[in-house]
Amino acid sequence: AGIYLGKDYDFTYLEDPIKAIEWLNEGNVPDLIISDIRMPLMMGDEFLRYMKNNELFKSIPIVMLSSEESTTERIRLLEEGAEDYILKPFNPLELKIRIKKIID
């Protein structure tokens, strides 16, 4: 997602959710998090639950990316607090529009 957003937004890429949590615990507060569903060390739904159950981070909007077109999964993640669910591959312009709607 970073290659599509770099010109319009400051973007920090972190390799896995554990590094993201460490980065957040260092005091970094992003306007938005984009997270894949399938990641090393911790799945995206676990990361989402961790974030939404943490008082410091629960207000940060999270957009989930997935290559699986599963209505059940999409509804579950939205119910668990995801701001949006975007199917991969995605149109870069659509991603920018959705992000703009969330953070503006």
Locate each region found by the language model.
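Two-component/phosphorelay signaling modules centered on CheY-like receiver
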Residues: 1-12
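C-terminal output helix
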Residues: 90-99
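Short, conserved "switch-loop" micro-motifs in signal-transduction and mechanochemical regulators
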Residues: 68-69
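Acidic, metal-coordinating helix/loop segments flanking the phosphotransfer/catalytic sites
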Residues: 13-32
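Receiver (REC) domain active-site loop signature in two-component systems and cognate sites
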Residues: 39
